[in-house]
Amino acid sequence: MNPNQKIITIGSVSLTIATICFLMQIAILVTTVTLHFKQYECSSPPNNQVIPCQPTIIERNITEIVYLTNTTIEKEICPKLVEYRNWSKPQCKITGFAPFSKDNSIRLSAGGDIWVTREPYVSCDPGKCYQFALGQGTTLNNRHSNDTVHDRTPYRTLLMNELGVPFHLGTKQVCIAWSSSSCHDGKAWLHVCVTGHDENATASFIYDGRLVDSIGSWSKNILRTQESECVCINGTCTVVMTDGSASERADTKILFIEEGKVVHISPLSGSAQHVEECSCYPRYPGVRCVCRDNWKGSNRPIVDINVKDYSIVSSYVCSGLVGDTPRKNDSSSSSYCQNPNNEKGSHGVKGWAFDDGNDVWMGRTISEELRSGYETFKVIGGWSTPNSKLQINRQVIVDSGNRSGYSGIFSVEGKSCINRCFYVELIRGRKQETKVWWTSNSIVVFCGTSGTYGTGSWPDGADINLMPI
């Protein structure tokens, strides 16, 4: 090859390489510009409209890094939108309840480090359910568990685990509390945590892991709250709190909270005479609660909360098959919707019920005097007809020979409807079982079903003779 041919060949190769590099730079430039404009757009599947990401509140910010030669291109994927829950779907139509979860905490305590607890409840965020309880600052196989029958100490804290995970040593202590309520507004968790002296307690309002607000005791007599989930609609969360006598008139208030800040307080109004430990559920556009009258009635009070104008209406469940313990036998018990029945009203237990048209679903202890056994059933006309007593779809959850305790409701939003679920506290130890010095619990959880179901009994199941003393 002569010198001229070499020069021509080298020039051709150089020109080809230069052309390729030029085309690559154009491709990189086009890609960069395209991704720059697309990082702020999300395609909306239903109608292919373009929705800007920036003005919305996002849950997570995911960035992918793509390397092309020496050029770095950042592409931001539009994240999942996070919105306040509004609970506007209808209530699911159910035929009864099916088993959902059981934590077996007491049985596991025989050979492991499990917290001593009471006052459990369940609540769900949009994607997952969690179990809560008030811990006693000790595990069961620890001498500090002696005398944990007492409700209020400075060592009690609110525990939170994924539903079905017992409260082990790695459990998160959400706040200091001997009375509590928790709920998720669609964006973050709100925890209402009461602690302090009986005559001057403090309620702390913790939102998204930060203390946002607080309120002190207004009647100087054991400020207390629901011991089950609160409810949030369109960013406004409601919680029922009582301060005052447990056996005479007390001062109940309904607090309205937005992102942890108390924005309004309404006094209880209506015909309810005594209200404690409410079990609340969303009933769009408001919130409905079924509570405990510890003074006059073994029929349960109802508190209806209007989230928009902060108004409150209260009454009593109409069903003549009443839900509290102690109570009269079913043949002689009564309820006429508006007032306490003055039947074994003193004392009581936390419980639940919810309306289904004119009917009512409810749960209660099987024993009329003790926290033993647990049953659920539907009362035809039990929400609207005074002293209605036609019972259908009865189920035994815990047989009458085994202990139960508090129970409460929680709601789960499905694709087309809102399902109602409940938990039952299964208390073990003192005061009834004096062979041991501790008092603690496990839980069992059921949810509404439109299908068929069988029978059974789901007690705590721990052999007290095998337990640490």
UniProtKB/Swiss-Prot annotation:
Pfam families, alphabetized: Neur
Glycosylated residues: list them: 61, 70, 86, 146, 200, 234, 329, 402
Task: State the CDD domains in the record.
Answer: Influenza_NA
Record note on modification: N-glycosylated.
User: Per the record, what ranges lie on the membrane's Virion surface side?
Assistant: 31-469
Where is this protein chiefly located?
Answer: virion
Q: Where in the cell is it found?
A: Virion membrane; Host apical cell membrane
Report the catalytic activity: Hydrolysis of alpha-(2->3)-, alpha-(2->6)-, alpha-(2->8)- glycosidic linkages of terminal sialic acid residues in oligosaccharides, glycoproteins, glycolipids, colominic acid and synthetic substrates
Protein known as = Neuraminidase
Q: What gene name does this entry carry?
A: NA
